[in-house]
Swiss-Prot record:
Keyword Metal-binding attached: yes
Function: Involved in the synthesis of autoinducer 2 (AI-2) which is secreted by bacteria and is used to communicate both the cell density and the metabolic potential of the environment. The regulation of gene expression in response to changes in cell density is called quorum sensing. Catalyzes the transformation of S-ribosylhomocysteine (RHC) to homocysteine (HC) and 4,5-dihydroxy-2,3-pentadione (DPD).
Pfam families tied to this protein: LuxS
Cofactor note: Binds 1 Fe cation per subunit.
Record EC number: 4.4.1.21
Cofactor(s), names only, from the UniProt record: Fe cation
HAMAP family: LuxS (MF_00091)
GO biological process: quorum sensing
GO MF terms, alphabetically ordered: iron ion binding; S-ribosylhomocysteine lyase activity
Quaternary organization: Homodimer.
Catalytic reactions of this protein: S-(5-deoxy-D-ribos-5-yl)-L-homocysteine = (S)-4,5-dihydroxypentane-2,3-dione + L-homocysteine
Protein name per the record: S-ribosylhomocysteine lyase
SUPFAM superfamilies named in the record: LuxS/MPP-like metallohydrolase
Length: 159
């Protein structure tokens, strides 16, 4: 079997950032999948499931209620390796195009107070596995370390 595209990225050189993972075309429709890499793979500890789960709930809710992106948001969810998330948007985008959206999102998550949306037994299959304080810490770290100081090396996959 052929290696899928995401396994051809050199993860030893990959830095935290926002990358276009792939674009899929269906007739006139384009779906852009973003790699939102919050941790440096194989160098930093991975995120735990509890904070990732909290980020997933907060981000999915924020994006699906966003005035400009609600109708363009297809999916937001965790990577199996626990170093980041995938965001799929309807449209033809470059990484830099969504930095303002992600800055807004990560600021929202870093400052979030209250009950995590959907964090109940009725709404979620694993609602007890959430860690809001750690999710806020990680969102704030990614916001300040990466999004507010983003450079080309955090927007384009390494060769």
């Amino acid at each position: 079997m052929e290696k899928i595209a995401s396994f051809t990225i050199n993860h030893l050189e990959l830095l935290p950032g926002v990358y276009v993972s792939r674009q899929d075309k269906f007739g006139d429709t384009v779906l852009t999948t973003f790699d939102i890499r919050m941790n440096r793979p194989n160098f930093e500890p991975t995120m735990n499931t509890a904070e990732m789960h909290a980020i997933e709930h907060l981000a999915a809710t924020f994006l699906r209620n966003h005035k400009d992106y609600a109708d363009k948001t297809v999916y937001f969810g965790p990577m199996g390796c626990r170093t980041g998330f995938y965001l799929i948007l309807h449209g033809d985008y470059k990484s830099k195009d969504i930095v303002p959206l992600l800055t807004e999102l990560y600021k929202f998550m870093a400052e979030f107070e209250g009950d995590i949306p959907g964090a109940s037994a009725k709404d979620c299959g694993n609602y007890l596995d959430m860690n809001l304080p750690m999710a806020k810490y990680l969102a704030n770290k990614f916001l300040n370390d990466i999004l507010l100081n983003i450079t080309e090396k955090n927007l384009v996959y390494p060769n």
